[in-house]
Amino acid sequence: RNYKSPRSNLSELRIVLLGGRWTGKSSAGNTILGREEFVTEGRTAQCVKRQREVAGRQVTVVDTPGWRKSWSVENTPELDKQEIVHSVSLCPRGPCALFIVLRVDASFTETDRRSVEEHLELLSKTVWRHTIVLFTRGDRLGDRTIEQHIEAEGEALRWLVGKCGNRYHVLNNEMRGDVTQVTELLEKVEELVARNSGRHFTVGERMESWEDHVESDRLHCNSNKFITVGIH
């Protein structure tokens, strides 16, 4: 079942969109804000932040560079990883929610699952308390419900949805005029904030994780140097 909880009525909401390339992050940002704020042609190379009043709330959306589908975090360019980590700093006091953006018409394999997990945990191991799965291209569901899609897609997608506390939402980016889908999304963000007792994802959580990642890379490099010296 989709997540339902008492919610806080907030005047300001801050959202970060994360996910692989070509999943529809920029289009989702435009749908949420109700106008063309993000460029949808070509690849997003740097974080982009846009703000607008939506349904009586001041909404901030941060779009981020996507990683290649199925890529391990080790294969993702360092600049892209830095931008992903930087994204939360663009939200004063931290984002209220981080959306993992997936296309409803694309398969989601175990390799995809590991890729999402690795990239999300660049931010923190605790990031999952603040995440919601956002499915784009909702029109491709046809007669199926999103619950039927999640069940049919397999264990990898069910794991991801479960890891996000069974929080998910569907957007049809072809129906920008449908304000209900956006209002319901914002309400789910408010429910998430209420569940977290008003806490947002903090920069402190993010920095601790990034420092661990940098230290791991340093040790890996030193290990490789040691092996090289040993060979010679």
Give the label of every model feature segment:
Residues 1-61, 69-79, 90-93, 107-132, ...:
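C-terminal non-catalytic interaction/localization modules
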